Amino acid sequence: MSHVDDGFRSLTLKRFPQTDDVNPLLAWEAADEYLLQQLDETEIRGPVLILNDTFGALSCALAEHSPYSIGDSYLSELGTRENLRHNGIAESSVMFLDSTADYPQAPGVVLIKVPKTLALLEQQLRALRKVVTAQTRIIAGAKARDIHTSTLELFEKVLGPTTTTLAWKKARLINCTFSNPQLADAPQTLSWKLEDTGWTIHNHANVFSRTGLDIGARFFMQHLPENLEGEIVDLGCGNGVIGLSLLAKNPQANVVFVDESPMAVDSSRLNVETNMPEAFERCEFMINNALSGVEPYRFNAVFCNPPFHQKHALTDNIAWEMFHHARRCLKINGELYIVANRHLDYFHKLKKIFGNCATIATNNKFVILKAVKPGRRR
């Protein structure tokens, strides 16, 4: 938990999921402060759009202006909602939209936290292009090291004249004025053939490894079990290639695709519809924080390629939460399979949570682990 006084109000903010208290990561950064410093409240005219507000620092500070919070992270939405409540601000003060929704017309102010993925930034800028005016104040912010020439060129190409500020507390801002430059249409969904399958994999802008199959998933697919029955989960599904493979290998199983990214879940849905339409009735698609709210003892197996970063921050908190949720939601003798970089040492984490862990396969970079839920149902 951390405190910030941004000039609009004094806030107490925390990350979501909460980091440990030994070495906590902050729920806000200098770029949030820098963005808010640029706004004189008398200048705010028309709707306020906030893009990629990680844990609500901007939304909480500007809540009295009823801002729209736009992004592709359900975790960020949950974190923002929790910080609104914690600071005594009504959740209804902020309107939440995912990045694929239509943006409000003629905004007065647009604040953008520059996302890690340039493809997501382009998708968002193209969406803004349809609604902003020459009078809209457009300001983006990030750590100085995360603003590159390619970032500035993208703003210039999609929206118009772009300048940057000096660094402040290692953060920089981008100021942009909309001039409606000529811009060719470009597909924001990328597709490629997955070798040895006949499948075409479709990837929306914010999907991990959208330009091709990542090597961890490739290794995982080589070792997926067959002849499973009941409900199984592709947890953190991304574009759904693991779930697709499970559908093909396990015709008696139903697959639940889960991710905190609406774009990932929609990509998974699209990939089942276009590649295995006959199996669509065996699928469920869920935008969720891991398996929050899912009943215990539901699943026969969970498959997971857990992330070890949240936005720009390295953290194992999300993976740790996924493992705990999997244990709760597995049936007795249900199995959790994960693929991960070897250096992350998830073997001991799984053994601590499940009481057991076995290595299924390993190579020079990745390891596939299996843990089994022990005990009797209470």
Curated annotation (Swiss-Prot):
Principal subcellular localization: cytoplasm
Family listed: Belongs to the methyltransferase superfamily. RlmG family.
EC number: 2.1.1.174
Reactions performed catalytically: guanosine(1835) in 23S rRNA + S-adenosyl-L-methionine = N(2)-methylguanosine(1835) in 23S rRNA + S-adenosyl-L-homocysteine + H(+)
Methyltransferase listed as a keyword: yes
Gene Ontology cellular-component annotations: cytoplasm
Any GO MF annotation of the entry: 23S rRNA (guanine(1835)-N(2))-methyltransferase activity
Localisation per UniProt entry: Cytoplasm
PANTHER family per the UniProt record, alphabetical: RIBOSOMAL RNA LARGE SUBUNIT METHYLTRANSFERASE G, RIBOSOMAL RNA SMALL SUBUNIT METHYLTRANSFERASE C
Protein name according to UniProt: Ribosomal RNA large subunit methyltransferase G
Its job: Specifically methylates the guanine in position 1835 (m2G1835) of 23S rRNA.
Keyword rRNA processing in annotation: yes
Regions annotated as coiled coil: none
Keywords: Cytoplasm, Methyltransferase, rRNA processing, S-adenosyl-L-methionine, Transferase
